[in-house]
């Protein structure tokens, strides 16, 4: 039988007749579910089979939250320098250049102002794909300036966190951003301007220790990893087994660290419902 044997050897297909399968047609979730890429995008990058929320960046969040994907980006051209002349396995300047070329981003956060369900909203959204979403001087400065913009124009402010923490290549300059951003958020609170913190997967390190937990409401998406040190580090340090679902958004909500968890498809409606209520406005459908 020739079912599993080629009867004629040396058969070759001309290159022009080969059909290439485009990349990105399918997505496989951690549970093994296969999803069509177009279906995934139309479902807010959530796997319809198991509800898994795929990691997305500022482009996708702006598209979800701003009406008709229209917004004005703030401080668009700001980039990091290398004040410490830092070098580990490669020079910091080379690492930044490689990240910029790979992602098309200037740094790990983008800030913008636009309409969300008809009302103005300022959003600072982190991008994990840029050096792990690490917080350096530019990230802190852009968030601080976005908060200043919200304060000056009396607009609600929202930060979408997705970060591995402080950027080690900037050392103490990076750690200073925790204090800088916290002070700006305190100014918003004094002016009674709403601040919403959305912690997404993953939100860790100095980000968690600063602006990610300082919202008037702190919210998250299902299954997000949120903590200071990662679960492996905590377990290795304490030598103890960790509770079930430790450092997940569900665990933190149960312990009172989060106000609520929302599916991405409901995010825009829920944050605007909150803004309507806290600003004593008619609730929009």
From Swiss-Prot:
It is found in: Cytoplasm. SUPFAM superfamilies: ClpP/crotonase. Pathway: Lipid metabolism; malonyl-CoA biosynthesis; malonyl-CoA from acetyl-CoA: step 1/1. GO terms for molecular function: acetyl-CoA carboxylase activity; ATP binding; carboxyl- or carbamoyltransferase activity. It catalyses: N(6)-carboxybiotinyl-L-lysyl-[protein] + acetyl-CoA = N(6)-biotinyl-L-lysyl-[protein] + malonyl-CoA. It is an enzyme of class 2 (transferase). InterPro entries: AcCoA_carboxyl_beta (IPR034733), Acetyl_CoA_COase_Trfase_b_su (IPR000438), ClpP/crotonase-like_dom_sf (IPR029045), COA_CT_N (IPR011762). GO terms for biological process: fatty acid biosynthetic process; malonyl-CoA biosynthetic process. Keywords: ATP-binding, Cytoplasm, Fatty acid biosynthesis, Fatty acid metabolism, Lipid biosynthesis, Lipid metabolism, Nucleotide-binding, Transferase. GO terms for cellular component: acetyl-CoA carboxylase complex. Its EC number is 2.1.3.15. It comes from the Bacteria. Residues 24-285 form the CoA carboxyltransferase N-terminal domain. Pfam families: Carboxyl_trans (PF01039). Component of the acetyl coenzyme A carboxylase (ACC) complex. Biotin carboxylase (BC) catalyzes the carboxylation of biotin on its carrier protein (BCCP) and then the CO(2) group is transferred by the transcarboxylase to acetyl-CoA to form malonyl-CoA. Acetyl-CoA carboxylase is a heterohexamer composed of biotin carboxyl carrier protein (AccB), biotin carboxylase (AccC) and two subunits each of ACCase subunit alpha (AccA) and ACCase subunit beta (AccD). Belongs to the AccD/PCCB family. This is Acetyl-coenzyme A carboxylase carboxyl transferase subunit beta. The gene is accD.
